[in-house]
Amino acid sequence: MDTGCLSSMNITGTSQARSFAGQLPTHRCFASSSIQALKSSQHVSFGVKSLVLRNKGKRFRRRLGALQVVCQDFPRPPLENTINFLEAGQLSSFFRNSEQPTKPLQVVIAGAGLAGLSTAKYLADAGHKPILLEARDVLGGKIAAWKDEDGDWYETGLHIFFGAYPNIQNLFGELGINDRLQWKEHSMIFAMPNKPGEFSRFDFPETLPAPLNGIWAILRNNEMLTWPEKVKFALGLLPAMVGGQAYVEAQDGFTVSEWMKKQGVPDRVNDEVFIAMSKALNFINPDELSMQCILIALNRFLQEKHGSKMAFLDGNPPERLCMPIVDHVRSLGGEVRLNSRIQKIELNPDGTVKHFALTDGTQITGDAYVFATPVDILKLLVPQEWKEISYFKKLEKLVGVPVINVHIWFDRKLKNTYDHLLFSRSSLLSVYADMSVTCKEYYDPNRSMLELVFAPAEEWVGRSDTEIIEATMQELAKLFPDEIAADQSKAKILKYHVVKTPRSVYKTIPDCEPCRPLQRSPIEGFYLAGDYTKQKYLASMEGAVLSGKLCAQSVVEDYKMLSRRSLKSLQSEVPVAS
């Protein structure tokens, strides 16, 4: 349920006056979002577009008034005794308890998204010196965010932290920032397309253990599926429950739609449940998504009592999550450098990495090298000498999926919303939330700010922000029939931001699993991190963090080999006395 942006972006451009929907004067700043930009400058540059409406010559600012909106966060669930949390904690302790190196490795890491930050954090915990290079001037990669001239933040995606994310939950605890997660009630809330303005809930009772709490939530909901449909759905899932992980992995070759047909699951289950799940998990529809992705999510949600419980971060991710990691890394002697874009991976005669060459002419040398960028960036920079190696050749199957994140500030407080994530079940929108209610930093008692994931976005990522906002407003008119009209005759837009990501998380289509690489590459001293690499949480924030831990583990395990390589390299550079 993570939207994202690539870990390299330039926001440049000019401003121009125009009008929104032919009505109001506006101001727009923009950036290129063409795929050609990816090819020419080794990064995906995606559009960040904003609209600011002027009122009597003064820019819109928040004004507090009498209206009071009550937000209720829930206590942090007891996750510490779950098997997955304990396993994740054990992996974290591997780094803290490992033998401190006599000579720390200098490890150069490209990309300061969650994967790169995680790699750096755990290498520093093990006593090594990470040098983390980020191409842009902002941390976070797919969880990056920016502050506009009004002081409002806009993000690359609507990021949800689940109870079933054990490595992320451990990370928050290790950094001492558990209080930055705002836990919501244990429910999943779906809009009802045939009943505009109405919602259907799956409420998970606290008194029941897993999987009974999830089964109870499904059985109690009679608005989305009939009893015969529930029975057929359950029978279809039975092999997954009995067959376990082996069965789940075997379904990688089927799309969700193909699996449903094979298992005799009614089409309405797809319409009522799987479309929303597919778009939330990977921004694509069930006719493209691998069934393995759905089964992994269902397994996590149903096997852990608090697995599907959701939390929002209490503010913008770069400051509230990424900076604590950076501070931790620096406190242990590591470095984090922004505006450090890699232009080329230079090789030694034996095919190993000599150094990373940056666009500013700098050469960064280390004892080991990690690429923690999105897979599309890596594929552009793989040296020609490596391209025929099977490990790298398989990466061609892995392609980032486009997604768009939309933020709209309205002139009033919308009433038909919740302090929670909402599944729109719209053909154009995936999930959304009123961030003025769900997030402390964005709280506003007088005006709503809706953050929405626009997906699937392949046909829309090249369109103008005006078209995207107009289409979004048409969908919102169905979700808020009494409060929003497509022509703005009801709630008025004060401003908006549109963030386009032509290449986000890797597209989890059938038969991708064999192409996902291990973190340790066949090139000595070169490693990968990223949610596309081999780990059990697929394309997610949890997957990114776990991949970083696994990458760091590989480096630590290779310490002796890497030390010998570095010593040999130094000796070869020493001139021989004549």
Swiss-Prot record:
GO molecular function, one term: phytoene dehydrogenase activity
Signal peptide: none
Effect ascribed to mutating residue 506 to F: 5% of the zeta-carotene forming activity of that of the wild-type. Forms 9,15-di-cis-phytofluene and 9,15,9'-tri-cis-zeta-carotene as the sole products normally as does the wild-type
Pathway field: Carotenoid biosynthesis; lycopene biosynthesis
Reaction(s) the record says it catalyses: 2 a plastoquinone + 15-cis-phytoene = 9,9',15-tri-cis-zeta-carotene + 2 a plastoquinol
Annotated substrate binding sites: 300, 539
Enzyme class, UniProt record, top EC level: oxidoreductase
Effect of residue 162 to V: Shows less than 5% activity of that of the wild-type. Confers norflurazon (NFZ) resistance. Remains flavinylated
Compartments reported by the entry: Plastid, Chloroplast; Plastid, Chromoplast; Membrane
Effect of residue 538 to F/R: Shows less than 5% activity of that of the wild-type. Confers norflurazon (NFZ) resistance. Remains flavinylated
InterPro entries from the UniProt entry: Amino_oxidase, FAD/NAD-bd_sf, Phytoene_desaturase, Zeta_carotene_desat/Oxidored
Control of this protein's activity: Inhibited by the herbicide norflurazon (NFZ).
Transit peptide: 1-87
EC number: 1.3.5.5
pH and activity: Optimum pH is 6.0.
Temperature dependence: Optimum temperature is 37 degrees Celsius.
GO BP of this protein: carotene biosynthetic process; carotenoid biosynthetic process; protein homotetramerization
Membrane topology label: Peripheral membrane protein
Role description: Active with decylplastoquinone (DPQ) as substrate. Also active with other benzoquinones, which are strongly preferred over naphthoquinones as substrates.
Family designation: Belongs to the carotenoid/retinoid oxidoreductase family.
Descriptive protein name: 15-cis-phytoene desaturase, chloroplastic/chromoplastic
